[in-house]
Amino acid sequence: MRIGLYPGTFDPVTLGHLDIIRRASTLVDRLVIGVAINRDKGPLFSLEERVAMLEAECAAVSAETGTEIVAHPFENLLIDCARDVGASMIIRGLRAVADFEYEFQMVGMNRRLDDSIETVFLMAEAEHQAIASKLVKEIARLGGDVTPFVTSQVRAALVDRFGPPQMNAAQ
């Protein structure tokens, strides 16, 4: 059984994340979504909320592809998480050159720690390349409409936190 690990904070999960999840699920029999517990980032949504959002969003992808998709919180080294879940590959999404530079360093370190686990990069689809959870939260916080970047369920969660989008007087 081929097991892949797609790690991230997913605060919140975006259409870009879901695109990578959908495409990664065709490469493996089981896709583990590693939900990072990163206390330094100060997430907007709790770990439980992020896991629940991912489980809800991934159910349809799992049904569509036949791939088992599970959310798995982790707080240890990524390579240790990969070992813990039996992953033979770590899947990473790339949006831009800046992502590649960071990921290139991570691959080098992870290979030194365990060279039996490969890293597979999937380029974000063009329509998702600008999407970042950090920017989605900022748009929502400032009263903008996040509809183009997240699913309706995630949008509702953001509206619960920040209120509905404000109408721009210039429109």
From Swiss-Prot:
Gene3D superfamilies: HUPs
Protein name as catalogued: Phosphopantetheine adenylyltransferase
Organism: Dinoroseobacter shibae (strain DSM 16493 / NCIMB 14021 / DFL 12)
Subunit structure: Homohexamer.
Subcellular location, principal: cytoplasm
InterPro entries: Cyt_trans-like, PPAT, Rossmann-like_a/b/a_fold
Binding, substrate: T9, K41, L78, R92
EC top class named in words: transferase
Similarity remark: Belongs to the bacterial CoaD family.
Binding residues annotated for ATP, in chain numbering: T9, F10, H17, G93, L94, R95, E103, H128, Q129, A130, I131, A132, S133, K134
Localisation per UniProt entry: Cytoplasm
